[in-house]
Design a protein with these regions (language model features):
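A short, N-terminal "cap"/entry segment at the start of jelly-roll beta-barrel domains
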Residues: 1-86
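Short, conserved beta-strand element in jelly-roll/cupin
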Residues: 86-87, 91-97
Length: 100
């Protein structure tokens, strides 16, 4: 996917989330530069792969096939001594007419 398509998908999902008055965690809006300055206090976010996923499954037609996802919480069975959650919380957004 082109960066412009990813940015448009992010913006569309952000608007939907705002419409329903759901508050995203601050890390969903960090820039790459901000992430570069984040220390070990943010390892849980990195280790558990929290944040955005936008995909068109490599097919090149996001409007027809794909989805947007935000992982807010995620279990990590590989690091269960450090992270005890055994569940995930995710927001999934599929546009009308879009297949996933």
């Amino acid at each position: 996917m082109k960066r412009s398509e990813i940015n448009a998908a992010l913006k569309e999902m952000e608007q939907m989330v705002q419409k329903y008055r759901f508050a995203l965690p601050p890390f969903c809006n960090f820039t790459p530069e901000e992430w570069g300055k984040k220390g070990h206090d943010y390892d849980e976010i990195r280790d558990n792969m929290l944040g955005w996923d936008i995909t068109d499954y490599g097919l090149g037609d996001f409007d027809k096939v794909g989805f947007s996802l935000i992982t807010i919480r995620n279990g990590n069975l590989n690091m269960k001594d450090k992270y005890t959650k055994t569940y995930a919380e995710k927001l999934l957004y599929i546009k009308e007419g879009q297949y996933s």
